[in-house]
Amino acid sequence: METSLRRAAAPAGAVAERTVLRNGGTVRDAVAVEEPLEIRVDGDRLATTMRTPGADGDLALGFLFAEGIISGVEDVGTVIHCGRPGEEGYGNVMDVRSAAGMRIDPERILEGRRFVPVSAACGVCGRLSIDHLMERIRTLPAGEPVAPALVAAGMEILARSQPVFERTGGLHAAVLVGRDGAPIASAEDVGRHNAVDKVVGAALRAGRVGPRAAAGPAPALLAVSGRAGFEIVQKAAAAGVPVIASVSAPSSLAVDLARAAGVTLCGFVRGERMNVYANGERLGLTGP
C-alpha cells in the first residue's frame, strides 16, 4: 500500500529555546512550547487546556464536536483568536461563534454533567460518571473490512508527521488516514487528547467528518503516539473513525469502551504486528 511519507513542517510558535547544562557546559536546547488555551463559545468561557500552539481553531472545533456541543461545522460561524496581535496573551483565547440562525448551547448539552476546565492530561475528569459517557457514546456499524496493511501504513505516516518531536522529543502526535492510505490530517501537541482534537477539527473543516461530510471518503484509521486512553476512543467514535492504532498500550476503560462502541482498537503496533483488543473482525481476525 502506497503512503505519503513527506515529512511535515513544524508550526510557528511550537518550539522555544532554553539554556541547559550539558557535559559540563551550557547549550541552547529546543523544547516544545506549552501554553494555556481558553476555549469560549459565543464569548463565554467553557474550558481551558494546556496545549502546544498551532491549529488552535481545529483543536477548539474537535473538542466541541467530541463533547457533542456542536454537531458539525454547520453550527459554527467563526472561530477566532481574541485580542489583537502584539497584546500580552494574544493567541491563547479562541472564541467559537454560532452560525447565523444557530445557537451553540453548551449548558443544554452538558446538563447533568459536572464540567470543569481541562488539562492536557485530563482524561475523563470533569464528567459526572463513566456510565453517563457509555450511555451517550456513538456505536459504529461493522462497515467495510479494513486491511491490516492500512494500520501499518498509518503508523508509518504517524512517524513522518512529528517534526516538533524530532527537534524536542516532547510531543504526542495523531493522524487520520483514509481507506486508501492517504493522510487526511496530522497534528502534534503536548497533550495526546489535544492532538486528536486537532486532527478531528481539521477533518471537520475539510468536510471529511460530521453529519454532512461529503468532501471525500471518511477517515478509516486514527493513529496515535503514546497510550490509547478512554477519551481517545470516545473522540474516535464521535468522529465515526472505525480503527485506532497506538504505538503503546490501551487502558482497561479504553478497551471496554471500544468493544461497546464497535471501534477496532490496536496497540503495540509494529508494522503488521499488533495486539488487537477490540473488534478484530473488522481486520479479518477472530477474538475480542
Swiss-Prot record:
This is Sulfur carrier protein FdhD. PANTHER family: FORMATE DEHYDROGENASE (PTHR30592), SULFUR CARRIER PROTEIN FDHD (PTHR30592:SF1). Transmembrane segments: none annotated. Keywords: Cytoplasm, Molybdenum cofactor biosynthesis. The keyword Cytoplasm applies. The gene is fdhD. GO terms for molecular function: sulfur carrier activity; sulfurtransferase activity. It is found in: Cytoplasm. GO terms for biological process: Mo-molybdopterin cofactor biosynthetic process. Belongs to the FdhD family. HAMAP family: FdhD. Mo-bis(molybdopterin guanine dinucleotide) binds at F268, V269, R270, G271, E272, R273.
